[in-house]
């Protein structure tokens, strides 16, 4: 049997269409969070990141997708944490060229090619 309603990912997944975009994930630094190379990340740029959110950030000339750890903000830095023990956290302080690009709200996987 098939679903009676058609799927509309724009309607079903995107709350802020003007500020939402997608990007294809490259790399394996978030595999323990279930985000794998080739997945599609749906990113909402209108959201302020909260501690523990998965974000896309621009760090010193490169994009990365990581958990954001804001618990060290009073000490003057934040950390971007991978979900793969083979990688180290990224320590961000005032000397870094850092910008939160958006908050990951969904990921989409392709299971069959």
Residue ranges, per PLM feature:
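Acidic/glycine-rich C-terminal interaction modules and beta/coil loop segments
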Residues: 1-113
């Amino acid at each position: 049997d098939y679903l009676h309603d058609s799927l509309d990912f724009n309607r079903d997944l995107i709350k802020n269409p003007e500020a939402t975009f997608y990007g294809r994930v490259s790399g394996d630094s978030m595999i323990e969070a279930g985000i794998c190379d080739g997945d599609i990340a749906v990113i909402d740029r209108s959201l302020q990141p909260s501690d523990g959110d998965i974000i896309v950030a621009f760090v010193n000339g490169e994009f990365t997708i990581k958990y954001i750890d804001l618990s060290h903000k009073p000490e003057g830095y934040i950390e971007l944490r991978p979900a793969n023990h083979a990688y180290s956290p990224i320590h961000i302080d005032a000397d870094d060229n850092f910008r939160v690009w958006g908050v990951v709200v969904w990921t989409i996987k392709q299971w069959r090619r």
